[in-house]
Amino acid sequence: MARVSKQFLEAYKPLSTKELKDPVIFVVDMIEGFVHEGALHDEEINAATVHIEALIRDAEQRVIFIADSHPPKTREFNSYPSHCVIGTKESEVIQELQPYVQELMRKNSTNTFTCPDFQSFLTERMDSYRDIVITGCCTDICILQFALCLNAWLNEHNKTDQRIIIPLSCV
């Protein structure tokens, strides 16, 4: 088993928002269907809301919300119960974060990276940002898939000036 060195851990100390460089903040799936109601909601997710709100306020930077939004019949419902159907309250950003919605991308899978709007963002705007901050839910599926695919893309395209940041209190 690989061991993480002390030097490695020291390189990943907490950052303040003032240390962010040209950031974009992604808020993934902080929507009614995961936070407050629906087949896949978990009330504990709401604990991250105040931290996400503070990050957005303190950073005063570009914020992009990602919302799980499915047509009534979608392949994902073969694996998960029906949730976050387009046009329902479940697919809407939670009220607490509504004032911060600058841009909204809707996705029909667990992975933001595959979302057509995000693919456009990659080619048209990614180079405008240095720090990509990922917040939201759920860490074992949506956040993990997004971060891993984005990191692989950054590696493949040798984007050495960009970094992915996932604040622990915001997931």
Task: Spell out what each predicted region is.
Residues 87-145:
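Internal catalytic-core helix/loop-beta-alpha segment
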